[in-house]
Amino acid sequence: MAMTVSSGDTTAHLDVDRILSLFQLSKEQLHMVMCRLREEMERGLSRDTYQEAPVRMLPTFICSLPAGRVNGSFLALDLGGTNFQVLRVRFGSPCEGVKHVVSETYRISHELMQASGQQLFDYIVDCIARFLSNQNIKEPLSLGFTFSFPYKQIGLDQGILLNWTKGFNIPHCVGKDVVQLLREAIQRWQVPMGSHNS
């Protein structure tokens, strides 16, 4: 069975090809992009230029990766915008890797995004306490805290908030160690926790 192609289909196909061709880069153009990206990363690494560099290259203080030696259960916290997520991640043997993940997501209201730092971090710890209760977790677990805002990490478990994004506006937190703010809220709520890492 033969298919017929209308002139309208051919014209549309040519239009798509023409538009796609605008996004195809030559080897020379790709090399220019690579060089420019490298320049910007080097500016971000330099003590003299990192402050104004578009690609900030701040140290993470992570000196090595676990290499399969991690086992047991851990809490993972993720504050990334209008949602806050609490996860329990269970690692098995090196061969098994991640065995099980359970998570709950909590909404961050617009009002809370404009509230005080204490209110925000108290809410975060309230969510952690609810998660622990919902999952019937009684033992203290070590936790990792993903804080998806610009911050300067000054140690493995220390991070100074540079500025808020994503609609948050809590000036009191800017310039403060967000891990310490979390620790203080955990102490206020008396939630049993293991060690904390940002």
PLM features per residue range, with description:
Residues 1-75:
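N-terminal charged helix/coil linker that caps or initiates catalytic domains
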Residues 2-4, 60-99, 142:
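Gly/Thr-rich phosphate-binding beta-strand-loop-beta motif of the actin/hexokinase/Hsp70
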Residues 69-70, 97-99, 134-141, 191-197:
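Short helix-terminating capping/connector loops at secondary-structure junctions
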Residues 103-125, 151-198:
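Glycine-rich phosphate-binding loop and adjoining helix at the ATP-binding site
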